[in-house]
Regions:
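Cytochrome P450
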Residues: 1-128
């Protein structure tokens, strides 16, 4: 389950980070003025084909998985270890209670918007 948790974090990174630029600059040929907001899309970095084999697939047994779902280095989220533990416990409890389930319609999964992203509805079928 810990490997699956890391893969879910990579594939469905929950957080976007926004920062205000301090000085005029340019990013990939686009001018950015001082005082403008920049959104750092960690989810797109976690889908980089130069870093991840089959990046658009969820592989719950993915071995190499240095994702940036919680940021990196000294700016990494302080709560990342707690979040991982909570996800692991939740998945373990779910699988114990409902060992046989399936997603009924992947296109019907909806997500919240904003800087913190998460599923709002996930249609599943619990089977015997």
């Amino acid at each position: 389950i810990p490997t699956a948790v890391e893969e879910f974090l990579r594939a469905y990174s929950p957080v976007f980070i926004a920062r205000v630029t301090e000085e005029d600059t340019e990013v990939s040929g686009c001018p950015v003025s001082a005082g403008e907001w920049a959104v750092l899309a960690f989810p797109s970095a976690n889908r980089d084909p130069d870093l991840f084999d089959r990046p658009d697939e969820v592989l719950i047994d993915r071995e190499e998985n240095r994702h940036s779902a919680f940021g990196l280095g000294v700016h990494r989220c302080l709560g990342s270890n707690l979040a991982r533990l909570e996800m692991q416990i939740a998945l373990e409890m779910w699988v114990q209670q409902f060992p046989n389930f399936e997603l009924t319609d992947e296109s019907a999964v909806t997500y919240s918007g904003g800087h913190v992203r998460g599923p709002r509805s996930v249609p599943i079928r619990i089977t015997d």
